[in-house]
């Protein structure tokens, strides 16, 4: 089934309105995936699949978009493709709640970071306060060096 049909089917199941086909076109254009509309989902790269699934969720204009590990198991090219698209979304009126274990992909688009360990909050605040060597040692039990390069985090394990 091609991407456009997957969106159409989703809209149909959710009480498709007359304007849903137009919404699909607009969202695909906004997410820069119009060129994928006739491709079979199973032939897309993992990054393209992630973006198309995010786009599908946006059709109904949610106030909050929940992303669970949006860049897990992606190669670097696909990771940055997804990160760039999420960055674009952050400029719209959609709030984004992102769950991730990959701290290096937390970008400047997230204005609040909550760090959990065993279901308890161990740090909460803006990312410059939360993402630091002390909190990461507490979270993972290893010593690391943390740097931020233009909004992208670099975490390097330190030898004991």
What are these regions (language model features)?
Residues 40-44:
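Conserved ABC ATPase signature
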Residues 106-108:
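A short, surface-exposed alpha-helical micro-motif characterized by mixed small hydrophobic
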Residues 100-101:
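H-loop/switch region of ABC-family ATPase nucleotide-binding domains
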Residues 19-36:
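Conserved ABC ATPase "signature" region
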Residues 65-69:
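Catalytic Walker B motif of ABC-type/P-loop ATPase nucleotide-binding domains
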Residues 139-160:
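ABC ATPase nucleotide-binding domains
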């Amino acid at each position: 089934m091609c991407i456009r049909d997957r969106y159409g089917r989703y809209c149909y199941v959710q009480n498709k309105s007359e304007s849903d086909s137009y919404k699909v076109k607009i969202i695909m254009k906004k997410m820069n995936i119009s060129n994928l509309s006739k491709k079979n989902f199973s032939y897309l790269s993992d990054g393209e699949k992630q973006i198309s699934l995010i786009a599908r969720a946006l059709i109904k204009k949610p106030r909050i978009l929940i992303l669970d590990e949006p860049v897990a198991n992606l190669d670097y090219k696909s990771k940055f493709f997804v990160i760039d698209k999420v960055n674009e979304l952050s400029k719209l009126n959609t709030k984004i709640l992102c769950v991730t274990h990959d701290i290096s992909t937390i970008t400047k688009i997230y204005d609040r970071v909550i760090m959990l360990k065993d279901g308890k909050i161990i740090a909460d605040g803006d990312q410059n306060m939360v993402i630091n060597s002390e909190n990461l040692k507490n979270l993972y039990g290893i010593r690391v060096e943390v740097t931020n390069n233009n909004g992208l985090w670099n975490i390097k394990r330190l030898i004991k």
